């Protein structure tokens, strides 16, 4: 039965047609918002406090969006019972990381954020809640750099390399700049917005520099566990199949995954609904965490956690059409399995 449902949903997704307009790719600002809201009814665009020039600093070079080669894909199994709706927050409600929206601020660290978020989730899930913590995006961002490593810090990085780094070097704990949670919390403060009643200073003119890699805890709360003893490791890192059912099976079985996609100007104007690219030029690449899926008025979607704080989108989340590889989101999924025995 689920296969028939899947076929019908893919057909529904394929039937989504956005009326073309020869000037749509060049639209910007209010003209873009007006066009998006008149051209389709799946999602709503609205004015954002942070301008486009600042949003681009949160993105990474599109060179980091290379789709996986078929021979590199490991996770290809398909479950016999895929539900129409799934939300990891409901499936594993006791895992603190799953419902946590982070803020990458003025740095293209999305690749490290999405990895740290999904790895935190999977560690909690695999341990049945025994290891329930937030793992550090800062540890990845600052230390997994260089030509033969993840990439270039705040300029972007390869998601699969972040997961391989976790397998080889492990990740320490670390939460947000605001909470100073764990061994190595994020060191770049939020900027240019009011979030949860706190007004942060204006963002700097230039992209924040990549934090320096240090092999010690940096929390201002004087975290007691030494850096090397705080490491959490993975046993495997791999690419996930490009088919919808393969991605769903991986999430059902092991938890949220990391994906990357092309961001167009209309995406950052997203406020609610099921996103489908409608207008505006390409701005760069972005990595995020998929934690579920569903159907909204017949339109299948992925449920995704962004890292632009809770003031953006649907309280930090967004939904994007499922089954069309929208903006490349279904061809770059990566994941891994925690090594609980190796946990320090």
UniProtKB/Swiss-Prot annotation:
The keyword Hydrolase applies. It comes from the Eukaryota. GO terms for molecular function: cysteine-type endopeptidase activity. Keywords: Disulfide bond, Hydrolase, Protease, Signal, Thiol protease, Zymogen. One of its GO terms (cellular component) is lysosome. Residues 1-15 form the signal peptide. Its EC number is 3.4.22.-. Disulfide bonds join 95-124, 107-154, 143-213, 144-150, 183-217, 191-203. This is Cathepsin B-like cysteine proteinase 5.
